[in-house]
Amino acid sequence: SLVALGFVLIFKASGVFNFAQGAMVLFAALTLVRLMELLKHTFSPFLIALLLTIAVMIALAWVIERLVLRSLVNQPGISLFMATLGISYVLDGFGQAVWGSDVYMLDVGIPKRPIVLLESVVKGGVLVSSEDLVAAVIAGLLVAILGVFFQKTRIGRALRAVADDHQAAQSVGIPLNYIWLVVWSVAGLVALVAGIVWGSKLGVQFSLGLVALKA
């Protein structure tokens, strides 16, 4: 569901399925875990690496908007879809070239032991993975926050207008390039959250990008 939020964000802004979201999850997780290793002697490796990774994902959104999306304004949806496919392959290759292809363990303090719920309702209770429970809670919070963002904020309403009709949105003064920069930045941050949750559960490896298929 965390990966699905990234799909929804891009779809709402462009009406196009973002094939690169899984690659963004992997790239964000790889960047975080490798920066944590490089900063392991600092006072707070996770916090510093997290802030740097956020900056990297926002910079990535800027590069994507400037080099790819800007030239595809008012182009058919299939062109945008093919662009996201290309972005996916570039991110996979770039991530492997920069950070390597090993499997990395990511420990962010999420408990590994399962939790027993509803013992008073079901005999023996229901066994739930702590990591899955944390992921569900985070996904619920993000859905609520993004719902308010799309419905109540000026930028959110502009995003919906852009998704409906790029040309009409531009004709009323909505800056399409800025909107795409915002939505890809937010999608990158959602990918980072998904990468942290799934990376702590499965390890940070190149198959992590396949979690997008579960969305």
Model-derived features: positions:
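Hydrophobic alpha-helical segments embedded in the membrane of multi-pass proteins
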Residues: 1-6, 23, 27, 192-193, ...
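Hydrophobic alpha-helical transmembrane segments
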Residues: 23, 27, 46-55, 81-83, ...
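Interfacial loop-to-helix junctions that mark the boundaries of transmembrane helices
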Residues: 40-51, 73-75, 120-135, 203-207
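Membrane-embedded helix boundary and interhelical linker motif in transport proteins
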Residues: 13-63, 67
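Hydrophobic core segments of alpha-helical transmembrane domains in multi-pass membrane transport
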Residues: 29-33, 54-60, 85-94, 138-147, ...
